[in-house]
Amino acid sequence: MTYKAQYTPGETQIAENRRKHMDPDYEFRKLREVSDEDLVKVLGHRNPGESYKSVHPPLDEMDFEEDIVRDMVEPIQGAKEGVRVRYIQFADSMYNAPAQPYDRARTYMWRYRGVDTGTLSGRQVIEMRELDLEGVSKELVETELFDPATTGIRGATVHGHSLRLDENGLMFDALQRYVFDEEKGHVVYVKDQVGRPLDEPVDMGQPLGEDELKKITTIYRKDNIAMRDDKEAIEVVENIHTGRTMGGFGMDVFKDDLRKRLGDD
């Protein structure tokens, strides 16, 4: 019998959008073009054209003791070459951004190898070897996972995900890393992800618009699709909550079993 991953519960469009993100067989829709050079500028880890910094020799040049796990697992390219670890971090507006922190974490773990990811309420970081990071970042920025207005590339001072959008639909950014170009109708980055000014602005394209965001978002909202309208998702959450509460706090659920283990029949 072949097991088919379900990814996440739910019968609504929100749940389906989440499953698309996590499913490695689903190909993200490409919505914009960002050059490799521009992406490197926004990441801010190295200058365009600069060689990758290394933290150890290439694996082929290193002597290791025999290790069956190492022989079984193919290292990613950055690890093979000894490239250092770097990151990209996103903040996602609660106003129908395409992705959100836990969705990102699950998506990264399903789709990419060699990643370390950290989840907080308003931001999501992904760390990996810099060489591989740039390729992954390009996919995350050029596709439907990213909206220039409601998704922010923010390595520091990430606040803004829960604040109201401005008159152009942009999420608040205390460091003002990006601005709205009224002539083009595009969002342009004028600073890198930690707030250092760029020599030239980087065009991230046109915001997706409110109607499109409501179609592709992975966030349940009362003014779009409420979680309580998704019976299957609610049922699973309630089951988890009940199990953790009753079992975790030992409220008579395992009393008989515990007595047997202690020899108190």
From Swiss-Prot:
Domain of life, source organism: Archaea
Keywords: Methanogenesis, Transferase
Catalytic activity, as annotated: coenzyme B + methyl-coenzyme M = methane + coenzyme M-coenzyme B heterodisulfide
One Pfam family in the UniProt entry: MCR_gamma
Pathway, per record: One-carbon metabolism; methyl-coenzyme M reduction; methane from methyl-coenzyme M: step 1/1
Recorded GO MF terms: coenzyme-B sulfoethylthiotransferase activity
Cofactor note: Binds 2 coenzyme F430 non-covalently per MCR complex. Coenzyme F430 is a yellow nickel porphinoid. Methyl-coenzyme-M reductase is activated when the enzyme-bound coenzyme F430 is reduced to the Ni(I) oxidation state.
Subunit and interaction comment: MCR is a hexamer of two alpha, two beta, and two gamma chains, forming a dimer of heterotrimers.
Organism: Methanothermobacter thermautotrophicus (strain ATCC 29096 / DSM 1053 / JCM 10044 / NBRC 100330 / Delta H)
Cofactors demanded by this protein: coenzyme F430
Protein EC: 2.8.4.1
Family: Belongs to the methyl-coenzyme M reductase gamma subunit family.
Function of the molecule: Component of the methyl-coenzyme M reductase (MCR) I that catalyzes the reductive cleavage of methyl-coenzyme M (CoM-S-CH3 or 2-(methylthio)ethanesulfonate) using coenzyme B (CoB or 7-mercaptoheptanoylthreonine phosphate) as reductant which results in the production of methane and the mixed heterodisulfide of CoB and CoM (CoM-S-S-CoB). This is the final step in methanogenesis.
Classification lineage: Archaea, Methanobacteriati, Methanobacteriota, Methanomada group, Methanobacteria
Entry's Gene Ontology BP terms: methanogenesis
Protein name: Methyl-coenzyme M reductase II subunit gamma
Disulfide bonds: none
Residues annotated to bind coenzyme M: R123
